[in-house]
């Protein structure tokens, strides 16, 4: 709510999803990026700033249903593990990590660290297409092998994963059924 007296006179509104953006830096330069993230954007929120954001969500919600750690690309934040630990120490029912999957694909030990945050933890994995040309258009490079390797690691670790599609008419809209079946 917190007491804005908008839709609910009883102050019972709450956030079903809170998103914390921990950085602006990304290891991709996606043409479709709404966050204006890139490798040149070097800004990272400090651990103290992120903890203050987590505390504000908990103060507002009590026991938040879902907090998504996002960015930029949160897996390249130098304090990502400490940030996830800080989130797990709070009464948050479910934590989601929004990622393009590159680090998970390249670093199985990192993926193993992520798996220690289960069961109330999941990966929100960018997965737009099986077609290299569609990925080039949406993400600026063919990430087919990277996505498959990330999924291999996540499946090996039995880590809950949601595939997230940026859908663009005439680019990958013909694949939505195939992606749903694959998921």
Identify the residue ranges that each predicted region occupies.
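Canonical Radical SAM [4Fe-4S] cluster-binding loop centered on the CxxxCxxC motif
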Residues: 7-48
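Non-catalytic membrane-proximal stalk/linker segments that position and tether the catalytic domains
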Residues: 1-6
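Radical SAM/AdoMet-radical enzyme domain recognition
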Residues: 51-69, 77-183
């Amino acid at each position: 709510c917190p007491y804005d007296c908008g839709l609910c006179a009883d102050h019972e509104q709450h956030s079903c999803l809170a998103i914390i953006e921990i950085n602006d830096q990304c290891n991709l330069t996606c043409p479709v990026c709404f966050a204006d993230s890139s490798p040149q954007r070097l800004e990272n929120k400090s651990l103290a700033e992120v903890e203050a954001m987590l505390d504000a969500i908990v103060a507002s919600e009590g026991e938040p249903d879902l907090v998504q750690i996002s960015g930029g690309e949160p897996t390249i934040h130098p304090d990502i593990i400490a940030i996830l630990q800080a989130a797990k120490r709070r009464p948050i029912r479910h934590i989601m990590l929004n990622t393009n999957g590159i680090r998970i694909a390249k670093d199985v030990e990192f993926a193993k660290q992520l798996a220690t945050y289960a069961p109330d933890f999941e990966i929100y994995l960018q997965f737009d297409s099986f077609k290299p040309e569609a990925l080039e258009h949406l993400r600026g490079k063919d990430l087919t092998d990277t996505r498959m390797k990330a999924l291999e690691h996540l499946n090996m670790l039995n880590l809950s994963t949601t595939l997230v599609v940026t859908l663009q008419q005439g680019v990958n809209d013909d694949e939505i059924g195939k992606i749903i079946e694959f998921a």
